[in-house]
Curated annotation (Swiss-Prot):
Protein name listed in UniProt: S-adenosylmethionine synthase
Coiled coil: none
Highest taxon listed in the record's lineage: Bacteria
GO biological process: one-carbon metabolic process; S-adenosylmethionine biosynthetic process
SUPFAM superfamilies xrefs: S-adenosylmethionine synthetase (SSF55973)
Originating species: Pseudomonas putida (strain ATCC 47054 / DSM 6125 / CFBP 8728 / NCIMB 11950 / KT2440)
Subcellular location: Cytoplasm
Chain positions recorded as L-methionine binding sites: 57, 100, 240, 271
Pfam families the UniProt entry points to: S-AdoMet_synt_C, S-AdoMet_synt_M, S-AdoMet_synt_N
The reaction(s) this protein catalyses: L-methionine + ATP + H2O = S-adenosyl-L-methionine + phosphate + diphosphate
Length: 396
């Protein structure tokens, strides 16, 4: 059962400054891993008026024109003119990337790949809930879909006066752990100065909000706040400085589950901040898909240079068909959560990451993708291919 009667989550669009930074960091990772799948990459990005700075540590045999790549990401998002305050073609790009510390490398690299140590200490959480078809909390799902629709309406020309920066927030009402209504919707979207607030609010309401949210959950008491401060002309990196890793709750479960604090974007799979969080989602989703619980949160933790997790914990919030201790036993039997095993299990050594950097890392649909000669599946941690084996092992 959910302990909440109301719960709120937020999301931001691909044009939000922090998300620009995330997408640049993951574009750098993808470009490198496409040439050198065993590269070590930790790329951080800062964007502000007229400048994009990339920094971090990379060890690789690949060569990438990083300045050109950064510009392309910014332009593709929609910042392609001084009229919108930021232009990828003319902004300054600074590259201060160095090499990975040999002290870290010696703790990760092993002669036997399966003995690869964790790239750092830390704790990671995974979560799943049966309240939506994608086994994610409803508030974050709806928030993502709103800003995703905003980008679609902007790029397609349906609402040509929209600009890239936007934020959404959705409050859901719960009864007995199930979503029964949406009590509040907030959507703030950057726009051209020519459009009136009346026209903007009417169009956003009809073509974004009502188009996206389930009609049966909207009711006469639902509050709508569309651009509640009025004009939102100045946005993106002009309005706010953007940094990689500043939207970790947007990236995960919207606050419904706990978070270990480590960001995802710009990190290769040897960094358990990312790969173990993906594995946690994979485990939790398969547990819920198997019918072992209606809700499941898993915590895993690691020590730097050590392969085996230092702990695995499970909480099913009283919804489990078997005990949490039994589920932990099943997880240990069915999933290998050593870093190298996670990379293999989820097939993570492919240029799949820029797509994760906007609209959530979880609750997405796996798709086949080809980059050069490399064909692979994205969002592999969303598969439920181990649900039946978990059911069988649990005797259900």
């Amino acid at each position: 059962m959910s302990e909440y009667s109301l719960f709120t989550s937020e999301s931001v669009s691909e044009g939000h400054p922090d998300k620009i930074a995330d997408q640049i960091s993951d574009a750098v990772l993808d470009a490198i891993i496409a040439q050198d799948k065993y590269a070590r990459v930790a790329c951080e990005t800062l964007v502000k008026t007229g400048v994009a700075i990339i920094a971090g540590e990379v060890t690789t045999s690949a060569w990438v024109d990083l300045e050109d790549l950064v510009r392309k990401v910014i332009i593709d998002i929609g910042y392609n003119s001084s009229d919108v305050g930021f232009d990828g073609a003319t902004c300054a790009v600074m590259n201060i990337i160095g090499k990975q510390s040999v002290d870290i490398a010696q703790g990760v690299d092993r002669s036997k790949p399966e003995d690869q140590g964790a790239g750092d200490q830390g704790l990671m959480f995974g979560y799943a809930s049966n309240e939506t078809e994608v086994l994610m909390p409803a508030p974050i799902c709806f928030s993502h879909r709103l800003v995703e629709r905003q980008a679609e309406a902007r790029k397609s020309g349906l609402l040509p006066w929209l600009r890239p920066d936007a934020k959404s927030q959705v409050t859901c009402r719960y009864e007995n752990g199930k979503v029964v209504g949406i009590d509040a919707v907030v959507l703030s979207t950057q726009h051209n100065p020519e459009v009136s607030q009346k026209d903007l609010q009417e169009a956003v309401m009809e073509l974004i909000v009502k188009h996206t949210l389930p009609a049966e959950l909207l009711h006469k008491g639902t509050q709508y706040h569309i651009n509640p401060t009025g004009n939102f002309i100045i946005g993106g990196p002009v309005g706010d400085c953007g940094l990689t890793g500043r939207k970790i709750i947007v990236d995960s479960y919207g606050g419904m589950a706990r978070h270990g604090g480590g960001a995802f974007s710009g990190k290769d799979p040897s960094k358990v901040d990312r790969s173990a969080a993906y594995a946690g989602r994979y485990v939790a989703k398969n547990i819920v898909a198997a019918g072992l619980a209606e809700r499941c949160e898993i915590q895993v933790s690691y020590a730097i240079g050590v392969a085996q997790p230092t702990s695995i914990s499970i909480n099913t919030f009283g919804t489990g068909k078997v005990s949490d201790d039994k589920i932990i036993q099943l997880v240990r039997e069915c999933f290998d959560l050593r870093p190298y095993a996670i990379t293999t299990m989820l097939d993570l050594l492919h240029p799949m990451y820029q797509e994760t950097a906007a609209y959530g890392h979880f609750g997405r649909t796996p798709q086949q993708k080809t980059v050069g000669d490399d064909t692979f599946t994205t969002f592999t941690w969303e598969r439920t291919d181990r649900a039946q084996s978990l059911r069988d092992a649990a005797g259900l």
